[in-house]
Amino acid sequence: SDYSFDEHFGKPISSYPPRSVLFDYIQGRVRKSDVRKYIRFNTTTRWVEYNEETKQFKVILDDLVNNRTYTEIFDYLVVATGHFSTPNMPYFEGVQDFPGIIMHAHDFRGADQFKDKDVLLIGSSYSAEDIGVQSYKHGAKSVTISYRSQPLGMDWPEGMKEVPLLEKFEGDLGYFSDGTSQRFDAVVMCTGYQHKFPFLPDELRLKTANCLYPENLYKGLVFNKLPNLLYLGMQDQYYTFNMFDAQAWFARDIMQGKIKLPNEEQRNDDIKLWMELSAANKNHDDEVDFQTDYVKDLIAATNYPSFDLDAVAVLFKQWLKDKDENILEYRDKTYTSVITGTKAEKHHTVWLDEMDDTFERFLSIGPKKEKEVETL
């Protein structure tokens, strides 16, 4: 809430910026906060050990520039590596003999490679939804989404469909659990990620699926068995930057002694309460309300700048509604910022016609001219 898109770009932008634009915004926030001076670059955390007697962490580090391994001692350890970097790659019989493109959504950088191809997406969450419509937009011959438990259930355009889980491949032919089969040119595994912490011993590792409230984390970030070990950003997310900020402020106040933690039993009771609330969620709107209450709970314990979280929740629910109503056109919608009160600008080109996601193109003032389109 302390660095708006309006401030960074000097004007309102549209509500669905591509990754290059988000990256530029993040770089701007890094420059404004001058945080780089606190970061030790070209350094890898090799291993961590906890000393029960001293209540400290021994961290073994590799200096990649000087080819040097060294050790440092810390009172607190904050794990903020995220959980969207280690792809979960399930095995399907015959996949090793599939002759076409196989990738994980983690490595997807553009759907133009799928033009005129039959594309199979395995998984039924945001990645499958997004890569599916991107592939449709860029001219895929067909897009098939294979789900394990339940379909996304969108009103897909002609050429897109959902089928039950893939069972096996025979060459380029995929067989599904409903008895159907189809040939494919490309497969994208939209099968999620693993929480992976190879630098931590087993007893310090967070072990959880992707969920709104990981087990064993008090307030969603304090490792209950060892409260000077903190995990940031390990939840499934509706809120992103604001939630990360709220967690960081909470962690800061713990380390500075401003927040006094209850004992382990009390912390465990609080975890159970939040997990019960999470389990009671019946739909996406419930999940939005749950995470809104969670962020409110964090902010109430610190001096993080307050803002209207209920209004943010309304926007999330409108976004969900807009997607359900038209999966191909919802990105053309604009919303009013809760932080600045300004309404987003409508993008100069409707999403289905926009084939260029570069930073320069996004911030240009108008649609491409006919000759420019012909040269793409």
Task: Please describe what each predicted stretch is.
Residues I101, D107-G110, C190-Y239:
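FAD-site-proximal beta/loop scaffold in flavoenzymes
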Residues P18, L22-Y25, Y76-H138, T144-I145, ...:
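Glycine-rich dinucleotide-binding loop and its adjacent helix/turn
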Residues T45, V59, T71-F84, V119-I122, ...:
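Short hydrophobic core segments
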Residues R36, W47, V133-L212, K225, ...:
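A Rossmann-like FAD-binding core segment of flavoenzymes
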Residues N228-L376:
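C-terminal, flexible cofactor-proximal segment of oxidoreductases
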Residues N42-R46, D63-V65, H106-R109, L165-L166, ...:
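Conserved SAM/SAH-binding loop
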Residues S1:
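Conserved N-terminal glycine-rich FAD pyrophosphate-binding loop of Rossmann-like flavoproteins
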Residues F5-Y76, T81:
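Feature captures the FAD/FMN-dependent oxidoreductase FAD-binding
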